[in-house]
Amino acid sequence: MLTLVFLEKVLKLLEDGIPVRQGKFFDDELKMLHLSQFLTSKPILFICNVDENSIRKGNGHSKQVEALAKILEAPTLNISVSIEQELSEISDEKELKELLFEMGMDSTGLEKLIQTGYSLLELCTYFTSGPKETRAWTIANSTLAPDAAGKIHTDFKKGFIRAETVSYSDFLSAGGWLKAKESG
């Protein structure tokens, strides 16, 4: 239920030209904010399409966008669509990594966009793995294990006993679930 005090607080922010997402709210107000779905409460991400020489440091236009984004407390990404097109055509992982290294990049723009989007939306991925398949599930960062299990199937939440976890990097370095479990 929205309160008059809360709505007046939001109105004051908007009248002052301040996006609702930049307001300071108490926990109970944050719940009201989530229910109200104000457009300016939504997170923002600025993506600048730049030439290949401007990926790391940007250019005059992207610097203007970065200045605005700083005021709005929003992240920015410089991505070169022409480079992304070129990278998307490379199927060999080793060749892709070499090309990224030559360009002074640690990951593709698409990967950065996904990582930034997940962070901005406070999401994470968890994997379920069995003998036949491994599957990825997207959940909110604050999701508890029983609720995450319920994302797969409601019966899993009802019958939840425990979660056995291993980080993705540990899973890969150990060479699978059993070896990761054995190594602790």
Stretches found by the model and what they are:
Residues 1-184:
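C-terminal-of-GTPase-core extension/linker across diverse P-loop GTPases
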